[in-house]
Every structure is written in C-alpha cells, then in structure tokens.
Design a protein with these regions (language model features):
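Conserved alpha/beta-hydrolase catalytic His-Asp/Glu region
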Residues: 193-255
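Conserved acidic catalytic loop of the alpha/beta-hydrolase fold
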Residues: 118-136
Length: 340
C-alpha cells in the first residue's frame, strides 16, 4: 500500500507538468531573434516626418533572366514566409526582393503613422527605385494582395505583372454589414494575441481545419512579437493596420487595373476580417473565396484565375509544390493588357 501511495504521489506531481502548454518564443519589436533565410538589408528614409527603415531581402539569381519579382506579405505573415518561393524563383532566374512593410516584422514600428495602402505602395516604390528596380512582377498575399493591387493602380509602368494570392479586399466588408470597430477596441483585441489564438484563427479560416506542424513556425513568428518587450507597440500597429484594411477597399477599382494580372485562389479560404463583429447571417456569407475569385477575375480586364481546390488562405504554405508550379507557369504567360 505504501508503494502504491508513493506512485500516486509521484503521478500527481508529474501530471500537472505534463499538462502545461508548450512554451513558444518571444521576439523583439523588430522580430529580433527570428532568423530570415537570406541577409536582411534596410532601406532608411523619412516618411511623415519620421526616420524609419524598411527591412528587405534582395536575392540575386545565379543565372539571371533579367526579370524581378517583388513579394509582399500579409498582415499575419512576414517576408520570411516566402522562403521557399524565393528559392524557386531565384533558381528560375528571377531577382527576388521580399519586403517587410513599415509597421511589420523586421521594419520600423512608427506609433504615430497614418497607415494607408497608398503610403505603403509609395514606400515600396521608393525602395525599389533605390535598388534600381524599375519594373517588376509584384506578388502580394492576403493584405499584401490589397497592397499589390494598389501598387499596380499607382505605378502601372513599374508593374510587369500583378499576382494576387488569396488577397484580402475582394469584397467591401463594411458595405456587406461588418460593423466598424475603433482603433482602441482593436488594440484591446490585438493585446490578447497568443500562439493559441493565432493558431485557432488560422486553423479555422486559413487551413480549413487541417493543421501541419510546419505551420507552427509561422504562427510563432507572428505571435512571438506579441509576447516580447515591444508587445504594446506591435499591438497598436496591428490595430491601425486592421482599420486600414477595413476602411480602404480596393475592389471598386479592379476595372481600372491595366497590367497583366493573375489571381491565385485557394478555394476553401473563408477569411473575412471583422466577421466576428457581424451578425451571424452576415458573417456566414463573407469570405467565400471560391466565388470571390471568379468575381474579381471578371472585374479585372484580362485577368487569369488559377484555382487551388482543397486549399485555403495560404496555398504557397499549404501546398508549395503545387503553388510554385502554377506561379512559374503564370510568370511565363503573355498576351495580357499593357499599362499605358
């Protein structure tokens, strides 16, 4: 009996430890501590009266084909998420420039900044000019897709081709009935960000309930900044950029896009920022990317639609081989509208 009692005590002591949630890394304000796959450079400039720097990777191919691809990340992603695409594109002869936008990842986090897609597009164009990129394929994923569309509208002569990968902004959420949330309310929500909340959100909306251990790294990258010493600043930027996404639709200007365009759409994606604030019947209709992709392809003159059945919000992460093959095929296409 003594022996059994001892076993019970040991089991009781061990059980709580086993039940503890896994520890996840905390990163600095500029994603300090998270390694990128290539050397990170910084474009320093003044914007809205503030000195700041955009982090970026500029990867040269071994056998150049004379073309450049610019990669624009989403709100919950970074330039590093394109790790595989950088390699694939570089191997195919493309110069690849993967940018962390101001307010994100390894770039400056200005607290008193008027965030707009126009401003971010201007920053990006200035960066590209500084490294002598006059024209490029501009590929944007998620929020980066909205930015890429704005970039193509602002700088058509600098855009060889627009590629949007499950972009946000294929619908106007406020017009569809999603209530406005103040920056202060959004900040309160952003402060609650953890590995678990990010994973739960992505599992539901990005990956259609199918999780792979490989995704953990990207969740840790995003959530880790919310656990570090700069968490309040990171959360504030998150609130400002969420409001930017909600209040600055680009969908109404799709017919004005004049550059060759490819839409790459995972069909099971249901992403709709702010849907949790909307009435259930409204939320249920939002984020139908299978339908939204087709609608966008019709609205954009000469656009090509590439669909990924059974894939969600991040097909380049979820099905990289399938995605990369389709991307290289799209970049070899010709015969689309030409910018004036």
């Amino acid at each position: 009996m003594k022996f059994l009692a001892s076993v019970a005590v040991v089991a009781a002591l061990v059980a709580p430890a086993a039940a503890q949630p896994a520890e996840h890394p905390a990163y600095g304000l500029e994603l300090d501590g998270f390694d990128y796959p290539h050397p990170v450079q910084r474009y320093e400039f003044v914007s809205q009266g503030q000195r700041m720097a955009m982090a970026y990777m500029d990867v040269a191919p071994k056998s150049p084909n004379g073309r450049t691809v610019v990669l624009l990340h989403g709100k919950n992603f970074c330039a590093a998420t394109f790790e595989r695409q950088i390699r694939v594109l570089s191997d195919a002869g493309f110069r690849v420039v993967a940018v962390d936008q101001i307010g994100f990842c390894k770039s400056t986090k200005p607290q008193g900044y008027q965030f707009s897609f126009h401003q971010l597009a201007q920053n990006t164009n200035d960066l590209l000019k500084s490294i002598k990129v006059d024209k490029a394929v501009v590929l944007g994923h998620s929020t980066g897709g909205m930015l890429a569309a704005r970039y193509a509208l602002m700088f058509p002569k600098a855009t060889e081709r627009l590629v949007m990968v499950n972009p946000l902004g294929l619908e106007d959420w406020k017009a569809e009935g999603v209530p406005y949330a103040t920056v202060d309310k959004l900040y309160e929500s952003e402060l609650k960000t953890t590995f678990e909340t990010v994973k739960a959100y992505q599992l539901k909306f990005y990956y259609d309930g199918q999780w792979k251990p490989d995704y953990d790294r990207w969740v840790e990258m995003n959530a880790g900044m919310y656990q570090g010493a700069g968490r309040e600043k990171v959360a504030w930027i998150g609130a400002l950029t969420h409001e930017m996404i909600y209040t600055q639709p680009v969908v109404y200007e799709f017919p004005k896009i004049s550059v060759p365009t490819t839409l790459m759409i995972g069909q099971t994606d249901h992403t709709a920022p702010g849907a949790n604030r909307a009435p259930k019947e409204t939320a249920a209709k939002l984020g139908d990317y299978a339908a939204l992709g087709k609608k966008a392809a019709t609205a954009i003159p000469g656009a090509t639609l590439v669909e990924f059945p059974g894939r969600g919000h991040a097909p380049h992460v979820e099905a990289p081989e399938e995605f990369d093959a389709a991307l290289l095929k799209a970049l070899s296409a010709s015969g689309s509208p030409t910018a004036p």
